Design a protein with these regions (language model features):
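Internal alpha-helical transmembrane segments
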Residues: 1-16
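Residue-level signature of catalytic and energy-coupling elements of molecular machines
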Residues: 11, 50, 60, 103, ...
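Cytosol/matrix-facing amphipathic helices and coiled-coil assembly/linker segments
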Residues: 17-99
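Core segments of transmembrane alpha-helices
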Residues: 99-110
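Generic transmembrane alpha-helix signature in multi-pass membrane proteins
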Residues: 109-114, 139-141
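Structural signature of hydrophobic alpha-helical transmembrane segments
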Residues: 119-131
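Interfacial loop-to-transmembrane junctions
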Residues: 135-161
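Juxtamembrane boundary at the C-terminal end of a transmembrane helix
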Residues: 167-178
């Protein structure tokens, strides 16, 4: 089940990331055509974007000239400013592999008490799962504005509620079917 879930998560991540890349390419093609066929209209869009950011007069004209003189920068600016797309793209396969690896790494931790045939395996598994949720949340704080403690407890609470619901549904279905 762990492997199947890992593959499922990796496939979902791959498809989601691939969709982002496809969307980026689609809008890039649109902007390239606009620049080729209606450059003045696109130049005016650049001007409007930077006017809205507070530039005026000579500074505005200079920024517009600098950006539109460099086709790659012009397209990149349009993609970021007009469509809100990121400056860099993730690689779908790489993202999927990271997801799969992380899922396996953290997903195996709750199984340790069963593999080691520990007394009270279920309780130990719950304990290890809680620690794992907290650690994942703490690591997540690296990309967040929240403290490691806050992120750790946030993930612990959400993970515990989710795991409890899943366990409860499984228990209910087990009793329903037996």
């Amino acid at each position: 089940n762990l492997l199947a879930d890992g593959f499922s998560m990796a496939a979902s991540n791959y498809l989601g990331t691939k969709s982002e890349v496809d969307q980026f390419q689609r809008y890039k093609t649109i902007e390239e055509k606009h620049i080729d066929f209606i450059p003045e209209g696109e130049k005016n869009e650049i001007k409007q974007i930077f006017q809205n950011k507070g530039l005026h007069g000579q500074a505005l004209d200079q920024v517009v000239e600098e950006i539109t003189a460099n086709r790659a920068l012009w397209i990149k600016t349009m993609l970021q400013e007009e469509y809100g797309l990121p400056a860099t793209l993730r690689f779908p396969l790489k993202s999927a592999l990271y997801t799969f690896s992380a899922f396996l790494l953290f997903g195996i931790i709750p199984l340790i008490p069963y593999v080691l045939v520990m007394n009270n395996s279920f309780i130990w598994s719950c304990f290890f799962t809680a620690i794992t949720f907290f650690v994942i949340g703490s690591i997540k704080s690296h990309w967040s504005t929240k403290s490691w403690l806050y992120s750790g407890f946030e993930t612990l609470i959400i993970g515990t509620v989710t795991a409890s619901l899943s366990y409860g549904i499984g228990l209910f279905l087990h009793h329903l079917l037996t």
